[in-house]
């Protein structure tokens, strides 16, 4: 997993240096893909297939590549933060998670621009370039920095989202909105941000980051405190006290659509 992430990161970094080599197309509303996403994905798939030809691979750009072993799934976002990459804003990552019978067991998030490799193995903690990670120990929202992402693919939730944001803003110190969900969760794990919330994510956005945050002592849940986020894509993360305070503030602003 680490080898695949580093190889993909090298492809991405090379193209970042030569912007003329990047071709962009639109695949949906406010949703872009580049030849670099596809090249990074291809090298990840090739690396996995070499060692584990029988595993199933699920990727953002090309969907499911079935293997004979349905129990082991690799969930991959070859370039999380494509919009930043296109705009030449150096904040994006490669996200790789290995799920066995539906449980994430191994996770890698790699930031090729900073050469930061976040890794986690279930039950063995999370690391950044080999150093153990612990999430922030904030006791409540006072003074906290919260990360988030706007629902740019689900603008029907814009008003509700802005209400939640406004409510939390009166309690916390400030927000960060950086454009890569995988790195947001990795930053929860390192304590660079105290908490994180976002709605309408896809499994490959957070599959790896979720385990890394958990293994650093964070809890991850949906907007009602449940575990339905794999289906809804609505996610809240942080240490238990921060998450409890975030949920309490969000509760009053949730629309019915976001309570699922």
Put a short name on every predicted segment.
Residues 46, 50, 58, 65-134, ...:
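Active-site-adjacent structural elements in enzyme catalytic cores
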Residues 194-203:
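Active-site neighborhoods of divalent-metal-dependent phosphate/nucleic-acid chemistry enzymes
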Residues 1-79, 219, 241, 248, ...:
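N-terminal subdomain of lithium-sensitive/metallo-dependent phosphomonoesterases centered on the IMPase/IPPase/PAP
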Residues 12, 81-82, 146, 188, ...:
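Buried hydrophobic positions in well-ordered alpha/beta secondary-structure cores of metabolic enzymes
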Residues 190-195, 218-219:
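Alpha-to-beta junction loops
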């Amino acid at each position: 997993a680490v080898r695949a992430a580093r190889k993909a990161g090298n492809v991405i970094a090379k193209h970042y240096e030569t912007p003329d080599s990047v071709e962009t197309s639109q695949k949906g509303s406010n949703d872009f893909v580049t030849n670099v996403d596809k090249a990074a994905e291809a090298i990840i798939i090739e690396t996995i297939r070499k060692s584990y030809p029988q595993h199933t691979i699920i990727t953002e750009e090309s969907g499911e590549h079935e293997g004979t072993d349905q129990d082991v799934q690799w969930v991959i976002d070859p370039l999380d933060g494509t919009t930043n990459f296109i705009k030449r804003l150096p904040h994006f990552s490669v996200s790789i998670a290995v799920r066995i019978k539906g449980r994430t067991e191994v996770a890698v998030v790699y930031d090729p621009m900073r050469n930061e490799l976040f890794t986690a193995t279930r039950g063995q903690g999370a690391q950044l370039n080999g150093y153990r990670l612990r999430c922030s120990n904030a006791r409540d929202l006072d003074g906290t920095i919260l990360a988030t992402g706007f629902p740019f693919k689900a603008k029907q939730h814009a008003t509700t989202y802005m209400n939640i944001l406004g409510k939390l803003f009166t309690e916390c110190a400030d927000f960060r909105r950086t454009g890569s969900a995988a790195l947001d969760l990795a930053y929860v794990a390192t304590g660079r941000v105290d908490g994180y919330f976002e709605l309408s994510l896809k499994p490959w956005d957070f599959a790896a980051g979720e385990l890394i945050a958990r293994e650093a002592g964070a809890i991850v849940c949906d907007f009602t405190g449940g575990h339905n986020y794999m289906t809804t894509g609505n996610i809240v993360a942080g240490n238990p006290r921060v998450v409890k305070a975030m949920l309490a503030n969000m509760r009053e602003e949730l629309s019915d659509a976001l309570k699922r």
